[in-house]
Amino acid sequence: MGHKSNPIGMRLQINRTWDSRWFAQGGDYGQLLLEDIKIRKFIMKTLPQAAISKVVIERPAKLCRISIYAARPGVIIGKKGADIEKLRKKLDSMTESGVSLNIVEIRKPEIDAQLVAQGIADQLERRVAFRRAMKRAVQSALRLGAQGVRITCGGRLGGAEIARTEWYREGRVPLHTLRANVDYAEAEAHTAYGVCGIKVWIFKGEIMAHDPLAQDRLMVEAQTSGVRPTR
């Protein structure tokens, strides 16, 4: 039997790059890595209603630049920017470097794998039928420009006694074509019967250029959104 490799790790430095973009000297690497993990966990836990797709952390000289990709930036920014300033101060206390926050709006959450996976997880927790949730997510993604979508749900689906895995796919989803622009994400649904796992693959076309930042550029162009610097 063949084994499916992680589409993100497989394409690093080919058409996508890391979400932590910095270089550390000597023994600082472990400390900075722990800081990144704490920052991401804090943001995801503090802002669950903001529909956050990913958090990109860059560390130029004595600065921690955090870019939050979210479908609902207004939840993060708050009225007249009050909430984002509170968030910046809290993040500032978690790192020794100064913190700069950028909010990137995702205009098409239907073709963002992380948001699709989290949306299905939320529906399963609300006891929506898993087949209906999967089919609705696939059709929405294809309608907004995805060339192929595959969704897998595993666990005690529908409260069944025996756990199983169900999947649904429409279109083309190449798993081993390196030039393919495949977005992948996982999420968990904590239901009354236990934890269900959701995996989402979204194929958005092919990237012919060998450019690690190509996927980020294409996402910004597709979303037709701008970065909102706050400081």
Swiss-Prot record:
Which is a Gene Ontology cellular component entry for this protein?
cytosolic small ribosomal subunit
Q: Which PROSITE patterns does the record cross-reference, listed alphabetically? A: KH_TYPE_2 (PS50823), RIBOSOMAL_S3 (PS00548)
A GO molecular function assigned to this protein is: rRNA binding
The protein's matches in InterPro entries, at most eight in alphabetical order, are given as: KH_dom, KH_dom-like_a/b, KH_dom_type_2, KH_sf_prok-type, Ribosomal_S3_C_sf, Ribosomal_uS3_bac-typ, Ribosomal_uS3_C, Ribosomal_uS3_CS
What Gene3D superfamilies does the entry give?
Answer: 3.30.300.20, Ribosomal protein S3, C-terminal domain (3.30.1140.32)
| Domain KH type-2: residue ranges | 39-107
- Has keyword Ribosomal protein? yes
User: What processes in GO biological process is this protein linked to?
Assistant: translation
Give a single Pfam family match: KH_2
| KW Ribosomal protein (keyword) present | yes
* Keyword entries, A-Z: Ribonucleoprotein, Ribosomal protein, RNA-binding, rRNA-binding
CDD domains reported in the protein's UniProt record = KH-II_30S_S3 (cd02412)
What is the role of this chain?
Answer: Binds the lower part of the 30S subunit head. Binds mRNA in the 70S ribosome, positioning it for translation.
User: Can you tell me which family this protein belongs to?
Assistant: Belongs to the universal ribosomal protein uS3 family.
Under NCBIfam families, the record lists: rpsC_bact
Tell me the subunit arrangement: Part of the 30S ribosomal subunit. Forms a tight complex with proteins S10 and S14.
Q: Can you say what this protein is called?
A: Small ribosomal subunit protein uS3
